[in-house]
Amino acid sequence: TNVTGIATLFPEVVQFIVRKETGINSLAQMEGRKIAVGSKNSGTYYNAQQVLTLAGVWEKIDQQFIGGTDAMKELQEGKIDGFIFTSGLPNPSIIELAKKVEITLVPVEHDLVQKIVNSYSFYFPSTIAPNQYPGQTDEVSAVEINAILVSGPSLSDDDQYLLTRHLFGKPNELGQSHPRLSKMTRNSLRRQMPIQTGKGAYRAHSEAP
């Protein structure tokens, strides 16, 4: 594919959600359990594969290739034990789910966080603050990735440059347009992307203050 990166927009946290009644409190305890890992080849699927492989449990869980609202519905109905979901915090759908069934957010242990960050340049240490979700009273250790703005081959280098320059020129104004963009700054726009930066975007990044 000829997709290139424009800029980093906001962090998304890789969340491991299980039914509280399963008693699962660590990634290792997911062994043998039915865990929804996202649709095959989706972003969530790759996050699940990367994190759980380094945790040593990817091959040991009963992988269910469903994601999003389907996974939440199956968890609510007791058909699966847990699921992985990558999103900004808090996620409204998970808030609604937690009102219907007791859930646990499974932490990514600190040693594993370092292992993940050292293995993949696009992961960063993260925490899920208390009370993001109903019943979640403790801080939860996690990892995050960045949602990025990408460009296809139909966008010219010049247009790519103008778009990127606009982002750098008005991050605060754009941040007011949507809650997910509220923490966007010139520094956050520069965070490393997992794909190559486009030529026009690179020029704008180089010129930005």
Q: Language-model segments: what does each one mean?
A:
Residues 16, 30, 48, 75, ...:
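Residue-level signal for nonpolar/aromatic packing positions in well-ordered secondary structure
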Residues 42-48:
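Secondary-structure junction motif
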Residues 1-31, 36-39:
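Short, glycine-/small- and polar/acidic-enriched structural segments
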Residues 1-3, 11-13, 32, 100-103, ...:
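Extracytoplasmic
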